[in-house]
Every structure is written in C-alpha cells, then in structure tokens.
C-alpha cells in the first residue's frame, strides 16, 4: 500500500500532522468570553429551550463562516493582507478600508472588554476593584496597557511560554467546571426544565433567541485566526479537516458548559451574577473554592493574553498600510522593527475607550457588543466575496481551491448568517457601528490622497459614506437627547 505521503500532496514537509494541528486550532479558538457566557445569555432573558435553539443556529452559522475563511485562504492565497483584503478584492478600496477599520477597532474594543473582565475577576479577591470599571480599575488597567505597549515598542513578541500559561489558565477552570458538576452530581434536571420555553411574563421565544446572538458570536470571534493556523499543515487535506475538527471540539466544550450551567441555578439568579458568571455558578455547585479557581484562571489567562491583543490591534492597521488600505504613516517602524505609529495609536484608542467605560459606567458586556458590531463588517464582506466567486466560478481553479459547489453553499450560508447577525444587533448596533465608522472617512481620504489616488471613486462608495455620516449624526442626536441612549 502506498504511504500517506505518496498519496497526498505535501504543503510543508516540516508542517504539523492532523492531531497537533487540531490541538493548535482548539487552543487558539477558546475565548475568554466563555467564562461569562452563561450569565450573559441569562441576563438577556433566554431560558433553556431558547439557549438550545440558539446553539443550533450558532453551530450552522459559525461553521459556515469558518468554512468561508478556509475556502478564501485556499482560493486566494495571494491575498495576504488579512481578512479585510477579501473585501478590497471583491468590492473596491473603500469597502476594503472599512473592513480593515472594523477589524482594527474591534481589536481595540476587545482589549477594553478583556481589561474590564480582568479587573472584575480581580475584584473577587480585592473588592476595591468592584465590577472592573471603577476609577481604581481603570487607572490600573491603563498602567498595564501602557506597560504592554512599551514592551511591544521594544520589539517584544508573544512568547511560547506565555501561550502555554494562557492555554492552561483557560483549560483548567473549564475542565474543572465540567468534571466537578458531572462527577459530584450537581446537575439538577428540575432546574434545567424549569420554564423551559420561557417565563409567562418574560420575553417571547424569538426574542430570547435573538438576545443570545451577540454573546455567542463573541465567544467565537477570532475564528479567522484558527484558519491561519490550519495553514501550517503538512498535508493539503489536513487544512480543512483540522479546522472542522477544532471547531467541533471547541463548540462541544462550549455547549456542554452552557447546558450544565442551566442545571445549576435558575435563570433569574444566573442573570444577577457578577462577571465572570462561571465563577458564581461553580461556587453554587462546589463552594467558594470553585469561584476562586475560575477567577484565578481568568486573571492568569487575560494577563498573558492581553499582550497578544495589543500586538494584534497594532498589526492590523500596519498590515493594512502595507497593502495600501491605510495611510502610509501607519507603516512606519522603529529601530526594534515594531510598528510604532500603529502601536501608539491603537493603545491611544484603547485608552480613550477605557476612559469612556468609567465616565459612562459601561460594562464588559457593552464593549464586547461594540467589538462584535464592528467586526461584523469584515465578516459580512468576506462571506459576500466568497459567495460571489462561488457563483461566478472565479479563482476556483487552483490546485488547493475549494469546489464550486462548496464555495456557493458556504458562501451563501455564511452571508445569510452574517446578515442575520447584523439584524440581531438592532437599532443600538446600527447606532454604534455608524458612530465608530464615521471617523474612518477622513482617515481614508488622507490615505488615498497621500498615494495620489481618487477619493470615493465610485457612486456606491459615495452613497455608503453619506449614509454612514447621516446615520451617525442622527444616532448621536438620539443618544444625547435621551431618546435612544446607546449605553
């Protein structure tokens, strides 16, 4: 029998086998948001039946989205500027710029979210930090942010040792949560079945399902990074397999944690838990030691992971500048080869949002909602581009390109799912998105003029820019007039 190496095309002789590749996808995909997911869904009014249906929608949609990124990476390996490069290739420079902007601002907002979650977890051990958004928390978070910024400016990269600590800090509490509830028999079927489809005076079933969408997408934000990791495969066929297996493993873990949580305490009590809610759930199951372990895991995970988030936030506009989407100044590096302009600007934006979180008393949940709203722009554009090349049968004749049928199916499904997510964000989502994207227009104009290129060359570009400005102005009026407050 011919060996596997003889029967399969090799990408990289030194690449990773299927098992190691899948493990890397799993560790890269597990998000700190899982530690607060159960409480966040409960706070939205979702009972057991709605949560189960929501997970079903999430599985179909997120898997389709992951296959979109996987298919695009194989169909267009020449586009190396990040997922926003797909928007530029399909719909022009202005759409590509907005896609890059959304990805960048989402990274900055994610930094704020995790900083607030970090100090909320610290508040369990040191009550002075409160819910993570008081003055002491913001001051300490700011100091930590600029300490990490200084490290990145000196050329520090995310180290393997830090990755190991972050991975263990996430996996140990999650494993303990599952095992302790199962082995100690703490799961209560009566609690799980109570008000299964909703409370008599509560929100309707459809409203319950929609309320969970942002929280569910948040815990899967970053799946495009898992696709990049899958590109380290030794064999061609393992690229898609590792992505699918890794996603299935992470999804199963998340689903088990979510279902077990519903059998520990009633929804009304879960909705009142402090962030991270998993700590309160495990404390209810096994006592204070459970809360201590979860909070410690969150702290260790985020202290290490925030360095990576600072790097990601700075690399996004840097790569976009190199690709021609952002102004040339964003491509400047210092003597340590660090992207000095983007590091400072990204940390400055993060700092501004930290101040806003204190002034407006905004929570971790509000900022991750904003992060999801902004990252939906590159997600929608990527899915739309994959759908377009599928139905036009373009760029699908390469040696590693997906089939036409696969591109059409997952492109269309991914596009429908991302549009559904945009709809599920509601009026608040539209207001937040336009307000955050309006400042992008002068930055785009500066970059295009610096390269001697026409600004908003197409009619649809002008229309999009005009709509963003008008809706942003209306949104600001509605907010400050108290008609539709954003926060």
Question: Locations of the language-model features?
Answer:
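Membrane-interface "cap" regions at the ends of multi-pass membrane proteins
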Residues: 1-52, 56, 62-70, 78-80, ...
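Helix-loop-helix junctions that connect adjacent transmembrane segments
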Residues: 3-14, 52, 129-136, 168-295, ...
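Loop-to-transmembrane helix boundary motifs in multi-pass membrane proteins
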Residues: 13, 18-19, 139-142, 234-236, ...
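Hydrophobic transmembrane alpha-helices that form the core helical bundles
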Residues: 42-43, 63-145, 150-153, 158, ...
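Transmembrane helix-loop boundary segments of multi-pass membrane transporters
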Residues: 42-50, 120, 124-137, 157-166, ...
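TM-loop-TM module centered on a large, flexible mid-protein loop between adjacent transmembrane helices
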Residues: 84-87, 92, 124-129, 199, ...
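Membrane-interface loop-to-helix entry segments
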Residues: 136-187, 243-247, 372-377, 433-439, ...
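C-terminal membrane-solvent junction of multi-pass transporters and transport-like membrane proteins
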Residues: 333-334, 379-470
């Amino acid at each position: 029998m011919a060996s596997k190496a003889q029967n399969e095309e090799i990408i990289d002789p030194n690449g990773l086998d299927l098992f190691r590749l899948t493990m890397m996808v799993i560790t890269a995909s597990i998000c700190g948001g899982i530690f607060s997911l159960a409480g966040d869904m409960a706070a939205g009014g979702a009972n057991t039946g709605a949560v189960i249906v929501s997970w079903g929608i999430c599985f179909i949609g997120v898997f389709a989205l992951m296959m979109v990124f996987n298919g695009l990476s194989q169909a267009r390996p020449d586009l190396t500027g990040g997922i926003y490069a797909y928007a530029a290739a399909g719909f022009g420079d202005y759409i590509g710029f907005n896609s890059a902007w959304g990805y960048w601002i989402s990274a900055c907002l994610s930094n704020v979210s995790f900083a607030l979650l970090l100090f909320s977890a610290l508040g369990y051990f040191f009550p002075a930090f409160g819910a993570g958004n008081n003055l002491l928390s913001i001051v300490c978070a700011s100091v930590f942010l600029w300490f990490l910024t200084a490290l990145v400016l000196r050329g520090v990269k995310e180290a393997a040792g830090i990755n190991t600590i972050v991975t263990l800090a996430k996996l140990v509490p999650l494993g303990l949560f599952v095992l302790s509830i199962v082995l100690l028999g703490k799961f209560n079927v009566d609690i799980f079945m109570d008000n299964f489809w909703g409370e008599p005076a509560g929100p309707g079933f459809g409203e319950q399902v929609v309320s969970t969408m942002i929280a569910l997408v948040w815990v899967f934000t970053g799946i495009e990074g898992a696709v990049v990791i899958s590109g380290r495969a030794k064999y061609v066929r393992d690229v898609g397999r590792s992505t699918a297996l890794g996603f299935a493993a992470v999804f199963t873990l998340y689903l088990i944690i979510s279902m077990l949580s519903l059998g520990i305490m009633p929804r009304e009590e879960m909705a009142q838990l402090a962030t991270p809610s998993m700590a309160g759930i495990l404390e209810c199951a096994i006592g204070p030691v459970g809360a201590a372990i979860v909070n410690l895991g969150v702290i260790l995970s985020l202290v290490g992971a925030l360095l990576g988030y600072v790097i990601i936030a700075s690399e996004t506009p840097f790569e976009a500048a190199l690709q021609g989407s952002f102004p040339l100044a964003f491509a400047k590096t210092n003597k340590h080869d660090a992207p000095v302009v983007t590091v400072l600007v990204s940390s400055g934006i993060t700092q501004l949002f930290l101040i806003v979180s204190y002034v407006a008393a905004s929570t971790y949940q509000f900022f991750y909602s904003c992060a999801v709203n902004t990252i939906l722009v590159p997600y929608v554009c990527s899915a739309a581009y994959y759908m377009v090349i599928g139905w036009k049968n373009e760029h699908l004749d390469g040696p590693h390109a997906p089939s036409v049928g696969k591109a059409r199916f997952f492109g269309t499904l991914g596009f429908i799912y991302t549009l559904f997510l945009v709809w599920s964000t509601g009026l608040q989502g539209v207001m937040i998105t336009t307000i955050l994207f309006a400042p992008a227009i002068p930055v785009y104009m500066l970059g295009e003029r610096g390269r001697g290129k026409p600004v908003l060359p197409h009619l649809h570009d002008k229309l999009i820019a005009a709509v963003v400005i008008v809706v942003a102005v209306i949104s600001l009026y509605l907010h400050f007039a108290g008609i539709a407050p954003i926060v």
